[in-house]
């Protein structure tokens, strides 16, 4: 009976992040693309500013990387979120499954692991497909900062 209950409980509810397999870890990503938007850092304050400028490898419509398995060959500065460095990424969105599970919170109802597709996530406008612009189209990066400091308003 206990084995049946364990198998009916989703892995993210019965395992810690450290206990998950690599495949389980990867499946937590909802594919929103927020990690794939460029961030700018203030040289004086180290404050992070979020932009709507997509990495060159992000396919904006699908919010998928063009070369995910080889992304570091194309973008050496690409983010690699791991169990070990997760605490360093304080800027992760409040909707990020990695962040939520690390904080002991449940996955959002629109998460692809619960719904079986990304449609609900896109419908909730969690993904960047509605706001992202191509890096090649950007002239002035400051025009694309989403969380502008008060001095830049």
UniProtKB/Swiss-Prot annotation:
Signal peptide: none annotated. InterPro entries: Puta_zinc/iron-chelating_dom, UCP006173. Pfam families: CxxCxxCC (PF03692). It comes from the Bacteria. HAMAP family: UPF0260 (MF_00676). PANTHER family: UPF0260 PROTEIN YCGN. Belongs to the UPF0260 family. NCBIfam families: PRK05170.1-1, PRK05170.1-5, PRK05170.2-1, PRK05170.2-5. This is UPF0260 protein YcgN. It comes from Salmonella paratyphi B (strain ATCC BAA-1250 / SPB7).
């Amino acid at each position: 009976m206990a084995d049946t209950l364990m198998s009916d409980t989703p892995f993210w509810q019965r395992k810690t992040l450290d206990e998950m397999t690599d495949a389980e870890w990867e499946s937590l990503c909802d594919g929103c693309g927020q990690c794939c938007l460029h961030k700018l850092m203030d040289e004086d304050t180290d404050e992070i500013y979020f932009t709507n400028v997509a990495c060159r490898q992000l396919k904006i419509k699908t919010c998928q990387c063009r070369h995910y398995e080889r992304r570091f060959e194309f973008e050496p500065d690409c983010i690699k979120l791991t169990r070990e460095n997760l605490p360093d990424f304080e800027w992760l969105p409040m909707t990020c499954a990695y962040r939520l599970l690390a904080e002991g919170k449940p996955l959002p109802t629109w998460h692809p692991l619960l719904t079986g597709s990304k449609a609900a996530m896109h419908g909730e406008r969690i993904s960047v497909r509605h706001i992202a612009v191509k890096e090649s189209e950007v002239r002035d990066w400051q025009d694309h900062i989403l969380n502008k400091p008060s001095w830049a308003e």
